A protein has these predicted regions:
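Extreme N-terminal starter segment of soluble prokaryotic enzymes
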Residues: 1-3
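NAD(P)-binding Rossmann-fold cofactor-contacting core
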Residues: 6, 13-14, 18-38
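Rossmann-like NAD(P)-binding element
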Residues: 40-58, 68-74
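Rossmann-fold NAD(P)-binding glycine/threonine-rich loop
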Residues: 54-57, 61, 74-99, 105-113
């Protein structure tokens, strides 16, 4: 499975380690301080997103450009942000949760299965 990481802080690095342990290919990562990285990032089967609100606009552009599915645990999203994710869900598979413990459980199960 090809994985793109959106948000490369503590959580992003942990997800990278788990993905690599499972034999998944991490095709790249981007973060808020460098939003232009989303513009040139390669497509993936799924984007694992633990970034921040500031990354949402470039992230949505990346997902639409590459037709990559999204699993996100980003918190602090506004109603318009959630509406944008819901709209994206009409085009691509999208899973979002703001509860980190639930999000981690989902990621662990995904990585285990």
């Amino acid at each position: 499975m090809k994985v793109f990481l959106s948000g490369y802080g503590k959580m992003g690095r942990m997800l990278e380690e788990l993905a690599l342990e499972r034999g998944w290919e991490v095709v790249g990562h981007a973060d808020i301080p460098c939003p232009e990285a989303y513009e040139t990032a390669p497509g993936a089967d799924v984007c694992l997103d633990f970034s921040g609100v500031g990354a949402l606009k470039p992230l949505l552009g990346y997902l639409r450009r590459t037709k990559t599915a999204l699993v996100s645990g980003t918190t602090g999203l506004t109603e318009p942000d959630l509406d944008a994710l819901q709209e994206l869900g009409r085009e691509l598979p999208v899973i979002w949760t703001a509860n980190y413990s639930t999000g981690i459980a989902v990621f662990r199960r995904m990585l285990h299965d």
